């Protein structure tokens, strides 16, 4: 879950890229994408709620994950605040674009 990696890295002050880089390549069979929320008390704490669009930082982390782990299946999760279908399809197109770019870069 790329959003979970991002949220935990933010909350615990660790490097999300480094976290992904130490995972064994063979262990990653599927990637999940989701959004998160910020703590309502304004503490800066992020919460992996799966109820918001995928943010730019998570898309960037996803691109890194695809470079590292190759063409593993990806799913976009929404557990609450389900948006209109057009918005979900927009996120799907972003994920497909990142995956396609990764395939081209790996083939070069």
What is each PLM-predicted segment?
Residues 40-42, 82-86:
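Short active-site-adjacent structural elements
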Residues 58, 69, 73-75, 88-89:
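Rossmann-like AdoMet/SAM-dependent catalytic core
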Residues 3-7, 34-38, 77-81:
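Active-site beta-loop-alpha junctions enriched in small/polar residues
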Residues 1, 31, 74:
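Conserved, mostly hydrophobic/aromatic
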Residues 1, 48-51, 79-80, 91:
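Acidic side chains
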Residues 85-107:
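C-terminal helical cap(s) of enzyme catalytic domains, especially alpha/beta-barrels
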Residues 9-69:
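Gly/Pro-rich active-site loop or hairpin
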């Amino acid at each position: 879950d790329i959003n979970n990696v991002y949220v935990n890295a933010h909350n615990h002050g660790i490097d999300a890229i480094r976290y992904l880089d130490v995972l064994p390549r063979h262990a990653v069979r599927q990637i999940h994408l989701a959004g998160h929320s910020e703590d309502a008390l304004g503490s800066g704490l992020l919460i992996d709620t799966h109820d918001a669009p995928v943010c730019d930082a998570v898309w960037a982390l996803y691109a890194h994950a695809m470079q590292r782990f190759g063409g593993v299946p990806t799913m976009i999760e929404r557990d609450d605040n389900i948006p209109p279908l057009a918005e979900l399809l927009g996120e799907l197109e972003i994920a497909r674009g990142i995956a396609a770019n990764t395939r081209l870069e790996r083939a070069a």
